[in-house]
Curated annotation (Swiss-Prot):
SUPFAM superfamilies: Amidase signature (AS) enzymes. GO terms for cellular component: glutamyl-tRNA(Gln) amidotransferase complex. Keywords: ATP-binding, Ligase, Nucleotide-binding, Protein biosynthesis. Heterotrimer of A, B and C subunits. It comes from Thermus thermophilus (strain ATCC 27634 / DSM 579 / HB8). This is Glutamyl-tRNA(Gln) amidotransferase subunit A. Belongs to the amidase family. GatA subfamily. The active site is at residues 66, 141, 165.
């Protein structure tokens, strides 16, 4: 059952918030041991569900929250041994807003350590399996949230997207994932990876459910100086006819894709034309180089952000002789991928190489953004694959560069700050395939309106992996 359907039943008195919470908790306890979507569950869930006011706008809805988003009183690990026992004394703004409207945190979902990865294989605890094929990855780094949705272990989820970490797992697991305009959702309470790229984003099994989450979570926040003063009107934007829109298909993303992705793209273009959109091919010339710039800028910011985890003020304090030994032992707890990115970031920020790498990457970022702004003077939306292929088997991307290439089509939205939405667009065999839409800065609602039209025209909502009995 979809989140907005659950909410309607609660509002009519057909089911109580407690009954909804009990049903999802039972399903998680039965199915998640074989899936690994959750790192921890909210032990007070049923008590909170019994106390919630059923008249609140989100009463009856439980939310799976990625474990790099702070939850007061609930362990928040960022998928790392360094934060294995960290229980925040504060709440992320996005979570606080959902709870204020009656939603409940079901549990914390698995992720690649500190959000660094594209498969959830880099969690310090265990990998998450793809509900459509347990031998394949769910994507990352929000793989636990995507898998929980696909298996119907939760009706709603929060993830975070630094280079595609909401959209890529959404594509691999056949669900919807939105990377909002940078600043549209407060980052307060999000454990930082790369601060100029990070963005909390909603994940769901229908566009209407995304809108429900965004109306609750978005908006300005005095605790986040980068948050935008744009009032959320997502559910309102879904009403009425689809306006005539100009859709640009990004030429640089048309080659090198798997047969299923190519087929999904062709079918989607046919649907959008039938919906009245004018379609044309456009060029975003710098997009193929965006990945190289991203893997300079993101590690650079990570090396700065993660420097705080030395065991003195932040992070688990490992045993070691004197302060220096303690700091070395603490940082040895970082996983291999985190160490790799911190080393790269430290190198590109070093005095001898700063301009050659970091300075040039920042200049490229400005050019990429200028090209996108020029494109949106010609079209209203951009369409391209979320990933070049469906989910890959565990262990298939042991080469770090091969794993980094998973972000080929997604990093552009993060580098430019633009909103991007991945939506289910078909299958390759038994594996879901996703496409993504990009809109101009601040036009997140436009993405959802176009995706809803596609969803209604193709019945792409309600996708769910065949696990257990349906709720």
């Amino acid at each position: 059952m979809l989140a907005h359907e659950i909410r309607a039943r609660v509002a009519r008195g057909e089911v109580s918030p407690l009954e909804v919470a009990q049903a999802y908790l039972k399903r998680v306890q039965e199915l998640d041991p074989g899936l690994g979507a959750f790192l921890s569950l909210n032990e007070r869930l049923l008590e909170e569900a019994e106390a919630v006011d059923p008249g609140l706008p989100l009463a009856g809805l439980v939310v799976a929250v990625k474990d790099n988003i702070a939850t007061r009183g609930l362990r928040t690990t960022a998928g790392s041994r360094l934060l294995e026992n960290f229980v925040p004394p504060y709440e992320a703004t996005a979570v606080a807003r959902l709870k204020a409207l009656g939603a409940l945190v079901l549990g914390k979902t698995n992720l690649d350590e500190f959000g660094m990865g594209s498969s959830t294989e880099h969690s310090a605890f265990f990998p998450t399996k793809n509900p459509f094929d347990p031998d394949r990855v769910p994507g990352g780094s929000s793989g636990g949230s995507a898998a929980a949705l696909a298996a119907d272990l939760a009706p709603l989820a929060l993830g975070s997207d630094t280079g595609g970490s909401v959209r890529q797992p959404a594509a691999f697991c056949g669900v919807y994932g939105l990377k909002p305009t940078y600043g549209r959702v407060s980052r307060f309470g999000l454990i930082a990876y790369a601060s100029s790229l990070d963005q909390i984003g909603p994940m769901a099994r229908s566009v209407r459910d995304l809108a429900l989450l965004m109306d609750a979570a978005a908006g300005p926040d005095p605790l986040d100086a980068t948050s935008l003063d744009l009032p959320p009107r997502f559910q309102e934007a879904l009403e009425g006819p689809l306006p005539p829109l100009r859709l640009g298909v990004v030429r640089e993303a048309l080659a090198g894709n798997s047969p299923g992705v190519e087929r999904a793209l062709e079918e989607a273009l046919k649907v959008f034309r039938e919906l009245g959109l004018s379609v044309r091919e456009v060029s975003w010339p710098s997009l193929p180089q965006a990945l190289a710039a991203y893997y300079i800028l993101a590690p650079a910011e990570a090396s700065s952000n993660l420097a705080r985890y030395d065991g003195t003020l932040y992070g688990r304090r490992a045993a070691g002789e004197e302060v220096e030994g303690m700091m070395e032992a603490t940082r040895a707890l970082f996983g291999l991928e985190v160490k790799r990115r911190v080393l790269v970031g430290t190198f590109v920020l070093s005095s001898g190489y700063y301009e050659a790498y970091y300075g040039r990457a920042q200049a490229f970022r400005r050019r990429l953004k200028a090209e996108a702004q020029a494109l949106f003077r010609e079209v209203d939306l951009l369409l391209l694959p979320t990933t070049p292929h469906p989910a890959f088997p565990f262990g298939a991307r042991r080469d770090p560069l091969a794993m980094y290439r998973e972000d080929l089509y997604t990093v552009g939205a993060n580098l430019t700050g633009l909103p991007a939405l991945s939506f289910p667009a078909g299958f390759e065999g038994h594996l879901p395939v996703g496409l993504q839409l990009l809109a101009p800065w601040g036009e997140d609602e436009r993405l959802l309106r176009a995706a809803l039209a596609f969803e209604e025209a193709t019945a792409r909502a309600h996708l769910k992996a065949p696990l257990g009995e349906a709720l």
